[in-house]
């Protein structure tokens, strides 16, 4: 069975559906309106939008949030000393989410490809991400590796502080001990 997918730039009109899908996939408290507005703004630079959504008919089936280089905060989970390019040239691949029923068809890779092209137009020469190693079948790391990503460093308990502040991990609930793979 062949389906027609409609890829387009993320806009504020998509926020409610993005939050709904993010909650289903990543857990309660992962994303709200305030965070969504902030994440969206960080993806805009020089009139170029690095965020994308994909619809099947009227159903949102995936989205990619990417922060433009120099429009995101380096934190303790960023091993900048290990990065092969200057920090100011690095975009941040914040979130790539695909509805469970639509996984395995290249949607995540296509969303990443589109964000990479936009980030390059914005001036980035590389992108970094923290991938959820406990994703089903470690699919997050597998897809990013397939798309050319390399491991920079593993970070145990990456989302622990957030879980204590209200984020509900789909695996650990409110005491998350999942590990992130920092990849570029």
Spell out what each predicted region is.
Residues 4-20:
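A short beta-loop-alpha structural element at the N-terminal edge
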Residues 28-57, 65-71:
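Active-site rim helix/loop that mediates acceptor-substrate recognition in acyltransferases
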Residues 103, 129-141, 157-162:
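Conserved beta-strand-loop-alpha-helix junction that forms the acyl-donor binding cleft
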Residues 3-5, 58-63, 91:
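Glycine-rich phosphate/pyrophosphate-binding loop shared by adenosine-nucleotide-utilizing enzymes
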């Amino acid at each position: 069975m062949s389906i027609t997918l409609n890829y387009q730039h993320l806009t504020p009109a998509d926020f409610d559906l993005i939050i709904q899908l993010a909650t289903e996939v990543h857990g309660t408290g992962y994303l709200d309106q305030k965070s969504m507005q902030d994440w969206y703004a960080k993806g805009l630079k020089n009139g170029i939008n690095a965020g994308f959504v994909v619809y099947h008919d009227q159903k949102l089936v995936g989205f990619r949030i990417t922060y433009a280089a120099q429009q995101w905060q380096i934190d303790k989970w960023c091993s900048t000393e290990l990065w092969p390019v200057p920090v100011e040239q690095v975009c941040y691949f914040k979130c790539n989410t695909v509805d469970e029923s639509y996984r395995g068809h290249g949607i995540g890779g296509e969303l990443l490809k589109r964000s990479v092209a936009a980030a390059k137009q914005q001036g980035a020469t590389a992108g970094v991400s923290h991938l959820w190693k406990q994703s089903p079948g470690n699919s997050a790391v597998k897809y990013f590796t397939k798309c050319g990503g390399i491991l920079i460093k593993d970070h145990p308990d990456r989302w622990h502080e957030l879980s204590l502040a209200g984020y509900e991990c789909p695996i650990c609930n409110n005491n998350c001990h999942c590990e992130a793979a920092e990849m570029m």
